[in-house]
Design a protein with these regions (language model features):
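N-terminal helix-loop segment corresponding to the beta1-alpha1 unit
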Residues: 1-192, 373, 379-625, 653, ...
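Terminal low-complexity tails and localization/encapsulation signals of metabolic enzymes
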Residues: 1-10, 229-230, 244-246, 291, ...
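Short, well-structured beta-strand/strand-turn elements
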Residues: 34, 313-327, 388-393, 462-465, ...
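Short Gly/Pro-enriched turn/cap motifs at secondary-structure boundaries
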Residues: 62, 223-235, 241-242, 348-351, ...
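A short glycine-threonine-serine/GTX helix/turn-capping micro-motif
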Residues: 161-171, 193-195, 230-238, 251-252, ...
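Substrate-binding/catalytic subdomain of NAD(P)-dependent oxidoreductase enzymes
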Residues: 165, 183-230, 308, 325-327, ...
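Mid-domain beta-loop-alpha active-site segment that forms a flexible
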Residues: 166-181, 200-212, 257, 261, ...
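Aromatic-enriched alpha-helical interface/lid elements that frame and gate functional surfaces
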Residues: 239-315, 319, 665-742, 746
């Protein structure tokens, strides 16, 4: 019998969007009993509302985000149905919803309402823009949130339209699951529930983490504009860096300019390592970088992509070829690590699907049931959970309260634009919901440190263990996109906040023995360096779990716990997923999702896996091995298009698509007089009439080419062209005023300068201030992406000096005497 890590948890889910449903599915994958409530009075969500899913195939999105759930269909207009929902919620550990705040309050489904009957309920809410602030009631659409974060204008080549990648919503989905488990962990101690909020706004901010961190520190507007692919700050790495090969493919390089990479790379490319044009870091990443990139451009163009991939592999370089989705679908690493599955659907036959991004050694995620039909388990749920009799169930069915068919048209008034009561800001006064969890964080650069940061933000005692003398290589970051870092190194300090710092030489016998002693008193061991080094250093899972069977042993590998262990950085791995080659206008170079975007998502996935393992340990007393890889995580960043490709193998989902050819012109990006805007409207007769009224372009409504939904689909390119002309006539501010008057959903596409002063971001602690010793005062930085109402996270300090806490931590936390500490110094174990 398979052990289910979350088998003791019941989740009642009432959602309308795919990203929030996916948050619940992640809990179901690890064994939670997820009961999806389908409101029969609402029509089904149109999977092609944005025009990105052409006719044909089946609803692959739903097969992914609704798996491992049971479904009950209730007509929630009926008081009897609402009573059934109330009864279900009284038995639930978690209620997960994405309904608008105003509707939640109007229906009597607020946290206060539910907690009166079930004080321990964890109330999880997926919102658009957070629980507080002036814009908390804006529609929860990922495009609107992405437009506001500042990242969209930075992604393409100069002169190209802002790029919407669709990845922010995947951050939010995982944040919902992570926040749920943090609150459940705290509930196990206090017995009390609370509200968890994860918003699309916060998800998209974390998707642009490194660039946003850099802008908040440097306030340099050059970070808000696109960078040409041959103007990268490092010829061996850069957000837009791409070199074409002889067969029309693209090379990506992701190697910091250090002694670890430069000699090997220069030798492979036939560059003289001692050439005075680039014999120092400052020359290679400064005055000599453009000349070197021109030489590399010419040399890469002489050979095929396959040739270069083989050379990179031989030299063990973090470099590869940017692939399409076809590669990901057949990639052995994705299959052997269960990131992509081969499934058999009872109606559609054989197909591929995304699998499970986090590996758990003892309690792996499983596909226990396919996505259910609407209301498929209604009778089962009522009997098993509520003890209803057959006669009672039959009565509900005959009254239309319980069923399996959704309404075809909306029959309830929309509350999406209504206003709701803003909750008071929670103030953290205790030790945090993860107090008592001790993490030994032996990670470097970004992915692993992000994981440790998320745990530390919520109160875990995270001890960052670095090598003496130099420490984490991220301490040496000098520039972002060829722009010198500010007076403080935000790259390192932000993701290592709230941690203690220790310096231990793990190459010495005494250092390894010391770490083994610390493992005895640790809950989590976290590692993202070379997997080969674990056994060499005596830090492998078998060794450490023998020392402490309760230890959660967490790694952040590059390509998974099985198969390849070659060097991996964010962009190199992202290149293999296919997401980069489908973004942007046709013919443009592949587009990287943004500095650190994949790393940060991998760190979030790792934190989720650790929380699952800690929950299971509470029940069993045993830890286990957890791995969250860059490959597994980044495949999930591509869910909105990759899942559809895997199910259909339709190249449409792997191709670049021009905004000029948007299949729904009302869900598209347009340039206004002073900047770009994102309009997000389903193409219905009502919405088209509202849009025409807002723009004053009534002539469009009378144009026979656009007289119906079907006609507009046929003439979609002509309509985009007309709207381009119309939108250019006014400023974004003028358009937003007119759109608000006519109910048109839209947002200006902003830059990082706007993001830095965004009132909504500050109101929800998505941006924070804290003292920074390196800067000599307070600094502003990316804050807390998940809000807990009763035990919120907090930031007390940014990253510390190397080894600052070594001696005190050994004495106070691990019980090492001062005499022993002196001896460790003599042996070179600590500085």
């Amino acid at each position: 019998m398979t052990i289910r890590a979350l088998g003791d948890i019941r989740v009642v889910e009432l959602t309308t969007e795919l990203w929030s449903a996916f948050g619940a599915a992640l809990l179901g994958d690890f064994g939670a009993d997820v009961i999806r409530v389908e409101d029969l009075s609402r029509p089904a969500r149109d999977p092609d509302r944005d025009g990105t899913r052409p006719p044909g195939g089946f609803d692959a999105d739903s097969e992914l985000v609704q798996r491992n759930k049971r479904s009950i269909g209730l007509d929630l207009r009926d008081p009897a149905a609402r009573q059934v929902l109330a009864d279900l919620l009284a038995t639930a550990d978690v209620f997960l919803t994405d309904l608008p705040f105003a509707e939640i309050e109007a229906q009597g489904w607020s946290y206060d309402d539910l907690a009166a009957a079930n004080p321990g309920i964890v109330y999880v809410r997926g919102s658009g823009f957070g629980p507080r602030g002036p814009d908390r009631d804006l529609p929860a659409l990922d495009e609107l949130a992405a437009a506001r974060t500042g990242v969209m204008p930075t992604l393409p080549q100069p002169g190209e339209p802002p790029v919407y990648a669709g990845a922010g919503q995947m951050y939010t989905a995982v944040m919902l699951a992570f926040g749920t488990l943090v609150a459940l962990h705290e509930r196990a101690e206090s017995g009390e529930g609370q509200v968890v909020d994860a918003s699309l706004f916060a998800g998209n901010m974390y998707g642009s983490s490194l660039m946003l961190d850099a802008y908040m520190a440097m306030r340099d507007d050059r970070l808000s504009v696109p960078v040409s692919r041959l103007d990268a700050g490092n010829p061996m790495s850069g957000a837009g860096l791409a070199y074409p090969t002889s067969d029309g493919r693209w090379v990506t390089l992701t190697m910091p300019d250090t002694d670890r990479w430069w000699p090997s790379f220069s030798e492979m490319m036939g560059l003289d390592v001692d050439d005075p044009r680039w014999d120092t870091h400052d020359k290679r990443c400064g005055e000599g970088r453009r000349e070197m990139m021109a030489i590399l451009e010419e040399r890469f163009s002489q050979q095929s992509g396959a040739y270069w991939r083989e050379r990179f592999s031989e030299a063990r370089l973090s470099a590869d070829i940017m692939e399409r989705y076809e590669y990901a679908a057949d990639y052995t690493q994705a299959a052997v690590n269960r990131y992509i599955l081969e499934l058999e659907h009872p109606s559609y036959g054989r197909y591929q699907s995304l699998g499970f991004p986090v590996h758990m050694g003892d309690t792996p995620a499983r596909l226990r049931r396919m996505a259910p039909g609407v209301g498929q388990h209604g009778a089962e749920v009522l009997q098993e959970v509520l003890g209803r009799s057959d006669a009672e169930i039959a009565e509900l069915e005959s009254a239309g309260v319980l069923g399996t068919v959704r309404a075809e048209d909306a029959s309830r008034p929309s509350t999406q634009s209504g206003e709701s009561r803003e909750p008071e800001r929670a103030v953290s006064t205790g030790a945090g919901p993860l107090a008592g969890v001790r993490v030994l964080d032996l990670t470097v650069w970004f992915q692993g440190p992000v994981c440790g940061q998320l745990l530390a933000d919520f109160g875990a005692d995270v001890i960052h263990i670095e090598r003496p003398e130099f420490g984490d290589p991220a301490r040496g970051v000098r520039s972002i996109n060829a722009i010198p870092v500010a007076e403080w190194n935000q790259y390192f300090l932000v993701v290592n906040r709230n941690k203690r710092s220790m310096a231990i030489d793990l190459k010495s016998d005494a250092g390894r023995e010391l770490l083994h002693r610390m493992v005895e008193q640790a809950d989590v061991f976290l590692w993202n360096q070379s997997m080969d080094n674990l056994a060499t250093l005596g830090l492998d899972y078998e060794t450490l779990s023998a020392i402490n069977p309760k230890l959660v042993f967490a790694t952040n590998s590059g390509y998974g716990h099985r198969g390849s262990n070659r060097p991996a950085f964010d962009m190199t791995v992202q290149a293999l997923t296919g997401i980069m080659t489908r973004l942007g206008e046709p013919g443009q170079p592949p587009i990287y999702l943004g500095l650190g975007g994949g790393d940060a998502f991998g760190g979030l996935m790792s934190a989720l896996g650790i929380m699952v393992a800690l929950h299971h340990r509470r029940e069993t007393g045993r830890g286990q091995y957890v791995d969250a890889s860059l490959l597994g995580s980044q495949l999930y960043l591509a869910v909105p298009s990759l899942q559809r490709f895997l199910a259909s193998h339709n190249p449409y989902y792997a191709d670049q698509h021009s905004r000029h050819a948007a299949r729904n012109p009302l869900w598209n990006r347009y340039r206004a007089e002073d900047g770009w805007m994102f309009i997000c409207m389903e193409d219905t007769e009502e919405s088209f009439a509202s849009f025409c009224a807002a723009t004053g372009a009534a002539v469009l409504c009378d144009d026979p080419r656009f007289s119906s939904h079907q006609a507009r689909r046929i003439e979609h390119e002509s309509l985009v062209k007309e709207l381009d002309s119309v939108m250019a006539e006014r400023t974004t501010g003028e358009w937003m005023q007119r759109f608000a008057e006519h109910g048109v959903v839209a947002a200006p596409i902003l830059d990082f300068r706007d993001m830095a002063v965004d009132e909504q971001a500050w109101a929800n602690d998505y941006l924070l201030r804290a003292p920074c010793g390196e800067a000599g005062g307070d600094v502003e930085f990316r804050g807390l992406p998940v809000t807990l109402s009763r035990t919120p996270g907090r930031v007390e300090q940014l990253g510390l000096e190397l080894g600052q806490d070594t001696e005190l931590a050994l004495f106070d936390t691990f019980g090492v005497s001062w005499d022993e500490i002196a001896e460790l110094k003599v042996k070179g174990a600590i500085p």
